Regions:
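Protease-domain processing segments flanking chymotrypsin-fold serine proteases, especially trypsin-like
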Residues: 1-25, 30
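Serine endopeptidase catalytic core focused on the charge-relay Asp
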Residues: 17, 22-23, 30-32, 52-156
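Cytochrome P450 catalytic-core helices
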Residues: 39
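Histidine-centered active-site/metal-ligand motif
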Residues: 42
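Compact nucleic-acid interaction/catalytic patches
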Residues: 45-50
Length: 156
């Protein structure tokens, strides 16, 4: 049995035309029956580093009994010159968070993933105590289990 949090993380590869640019981490989030990929905004666009991909590719698992079965899934970042992703904001302005919607009908029929939902979010008055254990899941610098395409998990 695979821990659900491992299936909520997505390995992201950015491209500009056929050229591979960078690796990144993201996670799936569902709200009102819609599926999103959440990542850092600089993954989609970063002027200071001149990072301007036109698409991303994520790895999707296809078989719960054989996690080595997976496929790449390409997601365009722009249509007719307009961004398909949205920049995160807070009271001070733009933050380094972005989301892009994933069209469920475009996913392979047997896609296996888990997604966070609004019930996983802390409320405005919830507090995390100093010293609370933290689990970090992702694909640092693209590093991952190359057989099963699973993320790295570390406790802090």
């Amino acid at each position: 049995m695979i821990e659900p949090i491992l299936l909520a993380a997505a390995r992201i590869v950015t491209y500009n035309q056929p050229q591979l640019l960078t690796n990144a981490s993201g996670f799936f989030f569902e709200r009102d029956e819609r599926l999103f990929l959440v990542t850092s905004r600089h993954v989609f666009s970063d002027a200071p580093s001149k990072h301007f991909p036109d698409r991303i590719e994520i790895e999707l698992h296809l078989d719960a009994d054989n996690m080595a079965r997976s496929t790449g899934f390409s997601i365009p970042l722009y249509r007719d010159g307009n961004a398909l992703w949205r920049q995160g904001m807070d009271g001070a302005g733009e933050i380094d968070v972005a989301v892009i919607e994933i069209e469920r009908p475009a996913l392979p029929e047997t896609t296996i993933y888990c997604a966070f939902t609004p019930r996983h979010l802390y409320g405005a008055h919830d507090q995390v105590e100093v010293g609370t254990r933290l689990l970090i899941v992702g694909f640092p610098l693209g590093f991952h289990d190359t057989l099963h395409h699973m993320p790295v998990a570390r406790r802090a």
